[in-house]
Amino acid sequence: MNIIKVNNASQGAARAYDIFAETLTKGATVFGLATGSTPVPLYQRLVESPLDFSQATAINLDEYLGLSGNDPQSYHFFMAQHLFNHKAFKQTFIPDGKNPDRQAATSQYDRIIEENPIDLQLLGLGRNGHIGFNEPGTAFDSKTHIVDLTQSTIDANARFFDHEVDVPTQAISMGIGSVMSAKHILLMAFGAEKADAVAQMISGPITEKLPASVLQQHPNVTVIIDDAAAAKL
C-alpha cells in the first residue's frame, strides 16, 4: 500500500484529485466511484476542473434497495447532484435498487463490470471496515450482491435521513471480488472515528471480519488518510 498522510480532508481531496487527473491523462477510461460524505470535496474539485470525462465511464459501488433514482436519499440522486449533472461522462452506471428481480439486477451489474474493467476504483471506509456496502463477513471473492446492512452502518447513515426508521436496511453492492479486480484502488478515510478501521486495514490480519483488510493483497492501492484517521497506526 502507498500511504499518503495529510493534515485534513481538504488536503486529502486535493491529493485524490491529482491521482484522478494523472490516471485520466494516462488514458484511463473507467472510473469506479463511491458515495457518502468523504468523496464530496473531491467531486467538487472534479466539477470545477477542466478535466474531460466525456469519453469515460463511471461505475458506482452501490445503491440502497427500494429507493428510486428520484429519491433524494438515493445514490442516483447523490451522484447527479454532486457530479453527473455538472461533469459529462460517456456513460454512468449505478446498481438498480428498484428492480424486483434481484438476481437479474446483480447479474446485470456484474456484466457491466466485466465489460468495462475498472482502471481506478475510489473507496471510502466504514467504521466497521466495510468497503462499498460489503459488511464484515462478506466473502472476499463476492460479486454484486444484496446486503443486509449492519446496525452500525444504519446508525452512520441515519444522519442523512429525517427519521432513523426511514434508513434502508438493505443495499445492492459491488462485491469485494469486483472491487479487487480494479487496476488501481484509491481509498480515502478521514476523522478519528475511522482510526481503528484504518489501523486494522493496514496492519491487522487479513480477515473477512474486516473487509478492507483484503486490500493488503492488491498490488496497487493508495490510501489517503488525515492525522486523526492515522492516530492508531
From Swiss-Prot:
Enzyme class: hydrolase
Annotated InterPro entries: Glc/Gal-6P_isomerase, Glucosamine6P_isomerase, Glucosamine6P_isomerase_CS, NagB/RpiA_transferase-like
Record PROSITE patterns: GLC_GALNAC_ISOMERASE (PS01161)
Keyword ATP-binding: no
EC number: 3.5.99.6
Catalytic activity, reaction form: alpha-D-glucosamine 6-phosphate + H2O = beta-D-fructose 6-phosphate + NH4(+)
Matches recorded under HAMAP family: GlcN6P_deamin
Family that this chain belongs to: Belongs to the glucosamine/galactosamine-6-phosphate isomerase family. NagB subfamily.
UniProt name for this protein: Glucosamine-6-phosphate deaminase
Organism: Leuconostoc citreum (strain KM20)
Gene name of the record: nagB
